Each structure stands twice: as C-alpha cells, then as structure tokens.
C-alpha cells in the first residue's frame, strides 16, 4: 500500500519564494481594480493551500470507500472503514443509484433535486472540497441566450449573471445554445448549474476565472471554443476593462481558488480544455467527459511560475475519451491527485509534466493505444533521468490494459523528516481499485436531469 503521507510532500517543508504573477493574462490595462483583485487572489492562494495534502487525499478515499459499501455502515470511523471495499461484495438495494461514485451519490438519488439545488454544494470532494459557489445567494434564472452587449449585458443573460457582485446560483429557464462574443469573465461566489436543461457554450469564446474564488461549474457542454479578439469587456458589476486576445481555452483558471468543475462535457477547444495556472489552487475536476482534443489540461503555465508550488488539484471520476492526444493533465510544480478516472484513449501520453510536480495516481484505468511508442502513461518533459528520478510520481491500484504502464519515481514510503499531522498508517484508506472505474465513471459528462425525477 502506498502511504500518501510518506512521500508526498517533501516540498512542503522547503522554503517557498512566492512570486506574484507577472503575466498580464489578457488584461490590456492593469488599473487599480485589477491590481487589488490580484493582491486578493494571491492572499487566497496562500490561505487555500493545505500544508497537509495527504489528509485531503485520504479524506477523498474515505468517502469513495464509503460510497462503494452499499450495504451501509453504522459506525463511520476511520477504524471501521479500514476494510471498506477490500473484497466485500456490494448489494444493490436502491437501484442504479447504489452504484454511483462518492460525489454523485451525495445528491443524485433525490427526485426533488430541482427544489434543493444547493445541496450540490455539499457534495464536492478533493482539494476543491471547500467550494460552495453561489450557495449563500439567491437563484438567478438565465432566460436569454444572447451575448450582444459586452459592457452593459442584458438582464437575464449569462454575462449579466456572472458579473454581479454578490453570490448567485445561476440556472437556466430552458435549453440554450450560447455563443459568447468574448471570454466570459466570472466573479466570486458563483454557481453555473445547467441541470434540467441542455446548455451549450459553443462556437465562441470560453469561460475565464481570473483572480476569483469560490466558483462551481456544473452540467454544461463546452465545445468548439474559439479565441476572442479582445476589447472592452465587463468584468464585474462596477468595472469593465480592455482585454487582449483570449487563448481559446474552454475554461481558463488564472490565479483562482476553490473551484469545482463537475459533470461538464468538453470537446474541441482552440487551446486547452482546462488550464489552471498562476497560483490557482484548491480545485476539483470531477465526473466530466473529454473528447476530440490535443492538449486537454495544463496545470502550471511556465517554468518561472514558482507560485504554482502552491497548486493542489484533484482530478476524479472523469472519462478521457475518443480522439484525445495528451495532457490529461500536464503539470508543473504543485500536486495533483489523479484518482478513479477512465483513460480509454490517448495518442502521445496521458499524464506528464516537468519542474518536479507531485503526481499521485490511484485507482485509474489506463487503456493504451495500439501505437507501441505511446503505451507509457507518463512523460517527463524536457528533463533528464538523473533529475526526474527523485520526483514523486506514484501509482497505486491502477489498472493497465493493452500494454499500458506507468513509470514511477521517487520514494513511495519515505516519510518527510518533519511531517505535519500525518495520517497514521493503520488508519489510511485505500483508494478504490482501477477495476471499478468503469462503474464509477459511467455517467461522466452532462446529465439529463428532469425535475421531479432522480437525476
């Protein structure tokens, strides 16, 4: 058994020089407003960073094990859960909802989900577990799919909703196809909840989370995203600014904290599908489906951005599907917990990186492509073996098919010299094995939720 507390996080004890993000990030004019947002975001990054990340990964595996033990557990302590999922047969007592993963099982069995939408905010696991989005605000109903005014957006449009300076839980009156004229700049404390409708963000620009905190993006399609030309764009209720050309990412997370992306279907973006850079941390990406793309996820933008040592991201219960090539994810610095995902397609590699990131791969299924040179799951980029051999890239209970293999490095059980509140080994919870991934990810992507029926 790999013990996360033992190898992960030697860099935690090291001194960390914090570098304020220097990239302008498509902000043509860095005025007082953006300077203050950047300062606030840096503070949020430092406060959101968990110095004991092994506790977070163990917490995730605890709940994953609990969800799989469908016969029920009376005493939900760590000691009692040590044997959860270790060879026990599960009993289907409640129909298909007994087989859901730990996040979905929290809310999907409720046929009145539409009357209690905010229950969703209680269900996130992983590094983004403190994300609540717009839970503390009112419901905002998007009634108009247009995006015609970038400075004074029409009430009822999604651009009007996401730029309000207060928490909002944003839902949709009906199914919509939304073509964004320019990047959609989202403010703090927002939930975009597409349940009950088919919501497509397509044919235009993507979503931008820049120097913000506490955002949930749930149950929408994002496809065929293009670069935006820039110009004057509203970025909060009281401010607009001049933007340069946007990258064409589906979701661009820049200096943002406490972000949860769940049940999103993504296809064919001009640049990355999801980029998390420049001090972004406390993020969970779950239950999503990705197809038809080259560079899927980039975590850490450049070799100079040492602020990304604070990056902590959970990637869980996702399906990496047809016609994907690479970066699922590609990581610089930081730590990524890749757990219970289904990797059915890649052309070059699945998980890669440089600049000494920590990558914990647990209970994933990797099905290698027929290309002999591409069967290795991992790729250390632009780094010689003598350097990367000490990086902590670990695989536990992964399931490898068609010749797939994961090249590990680092010391799996080398305890940090000064661990802070480590989980005792006898209480550590094992991840669910990769052999169960097909079941755990069977509903990845958007859901066809209907009011009055279990989702």
Swiss-Prot record:
<dbReference type="InterPro" id="IPR011050">
    <property type="entry name" value="Pectin_lyase_fold/virulence"/>
</dbReference>
<dbReference type="GO" id="GO:0045490">
    <property type="term" value="P:pectin catabolic process"/>
</dbReference>
<keyword id="KW-0479">Metal-binding</keyword>
<feature type="binding site">
    <location>
        <position position="271"/>
    </location>
    <ligand>
        <name>Ca(2+)</name>
    </ligand>
</feature>
<dbReference type="InterPro" id="IPR002022">
    <property type="entry name" value="Pec_lyase"/>
</dbReference>
<dbReference type="Pfam" id="PF04431">
    <property type="entry name" value="Pec_lyase_N"/>
</dbReference>
<dbReference type="InterPro" id="IPR012334">
    <property type="entry name" value="Pectin_lyas_fold"/>
</dbReference>
<comment type="pathway">
    <text>Glycan metabolism; pectin degradation; 2-dehydro-3-deoxy-D-gluconate from pectin: step 2/5.</text>
</comment>
<feature type="signal peptide">
    <location>
        <begin position="1"/>
        <end position="25"/>
    </location>
</feature>
<keyword id="KW-0732">Signal</keyword>
<dbReference type="InterPro" id="IPR007524">
    <property type="entry name" value="Pec_lyase_N"/>
</dbReference>
<keyword id="KW-0106">Calcium</keyword>
<dbReference type="GO" id="GO:0030570">
    <property type="term" value="F:pectate lyase activity"/>
</dbReference>
<dbReference type="InterPro" id="IPR018082">
    <property type="entry name" value="AmbAllergen"/>
</dbReference>
<protein>
    <recommendedName>
        <fullName>Probable pectate lyase 6</fullName>
        <ecNumber>4.2.2.2</ecNumber>
    </recommendedName>
</protein>
<feature type="binding site">
    <location>
        <position position="247"/>
    </location>
    <ligand>
        <name>Ca(2+)</name>
    </ligand>
</feature>
<keyword id="KW-0456">Lyase</keyword>
<dbReference type="GO" id="GO:0046872">
    <property type="term" value="F:metal ion binding"/>
</dbReference>
<keyword id="KW-0325">Glycoprotein</keyword>
<feature type="active site">
    <location>
        <position position="327"/>
    </location>
</feature>
<dbReference type="Pfam" id="PF00544">
    <property type="entry name" value="Pectate_lyase_4"/>
</dbReference>
<comment type="similarity">
    <text>Belongs to the polysaccharide lyase 1 family.</text>
</comment>
<dbReference type="InterPro" id="IPR045032">
    <property type="entry name" value="PEL"/>
</dbReference>
<feature type="binding site">
    <location>
        <position position="275"/>
    </location>
    <ligand>
        <name>Ca(2+)</name>
    </ligand>
</feature>
<feature type="glycosylation site" description="N-linked (GlcNAc...) asparagine">
    <location>
        <position position="55"/>
    </location>
</feature>
<feature type="glycosylation site" description="N-linked (GlcNAc...) asparagine">
    <location>
        <position position="75"/>
    </location>
</feature>
């Amino acid at each position: 058994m790999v013990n996360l507390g033992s190898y992960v996080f030697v860099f935690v004890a090291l001194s960390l020089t914090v570098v304020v993000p220097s990239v302008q990030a498509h902000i043509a004019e860095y005025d007082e407003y953006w300077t203050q947002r950047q300062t606030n975001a840096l503070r949020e990054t430092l406060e959101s960073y968990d110095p004991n990340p092994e506790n977070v990964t163990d917490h995730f595996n605890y709940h994953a094990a609990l969800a799989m033990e469908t016969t029920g557990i009376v005493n939900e302590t760590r000691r009692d859960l040590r044997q959860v999922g270790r060879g026990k047969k599960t009993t289907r007592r409640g129909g298909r909802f007994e087989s859901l993963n730990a996040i979905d099982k929290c809310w999907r069995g409720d046929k009145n989900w539409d009357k209690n939408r905010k229950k969703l905010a209680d269900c996130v696991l992983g590094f983004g577990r403190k994300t609540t989005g717009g839970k503390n605000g009112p419901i905002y109903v998007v009634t108009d799919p247009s995006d015609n005014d970038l400075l004074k957006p029409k009430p009822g449009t999604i651009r009007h909703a996401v730029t309000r300076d207060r928490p909002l839980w944003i839902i949709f009156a009906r199914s919509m196809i939304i073509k964004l004229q320019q990047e959609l700049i989202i403010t703090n404390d927002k939930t975009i909840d597409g349940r009950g409708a088919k919501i497509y963000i397509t044919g235009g620009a993507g979503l931008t989370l820049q120097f913000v905190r506490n955002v949930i993006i749930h149950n929408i399609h994002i496809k065929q995203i293009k670069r935006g030309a820039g110009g004057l764009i509203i970025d909060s209720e009281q401010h607009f600014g001049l933007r340069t050309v946007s990258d064409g990412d589906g979701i661009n997370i820049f200096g943002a904290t406490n972000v949860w992306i769940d049940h999103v279907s993504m296809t064919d973006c001009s640049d990355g599908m999801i980029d998390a850079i420049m001090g972004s941390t406390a993020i969970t990406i779950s239950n999503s489906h990705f197809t038809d793309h080259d560079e899927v996820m980039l975590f850490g933008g450049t070799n100079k951005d040492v602020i990304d040592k604070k990056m902590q991201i959970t990637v869980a219960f996702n399906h990496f599907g047809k016609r994907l090539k690479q970066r699922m994810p590609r990581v610089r610095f930081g730590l990524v917990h890749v757990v219970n995902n289904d990797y059915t397609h890649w052309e070059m590699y699945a998980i890669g990186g440089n600049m000494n990131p920590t990558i914990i791969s647990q209970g994933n299924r990797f099905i290698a492509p027929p290309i002999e040179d591409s069967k290795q799951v991992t790729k250390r980029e632009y780094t010689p073996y003598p350097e990367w051999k000490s990086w902590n890239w670990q695989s536990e209970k992964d399931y490898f098919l068609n010749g797939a293999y994961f090249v590990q490095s680092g010391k799996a059980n080398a305890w940090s010299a000064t661990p802070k509140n480590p989980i005792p080994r006898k209480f550590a919870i094992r991840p669910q094995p990769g052999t169960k991934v097909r079941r755990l990810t069977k509903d990845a992507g958007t859901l066809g939720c209907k009011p009055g029926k279990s989702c």
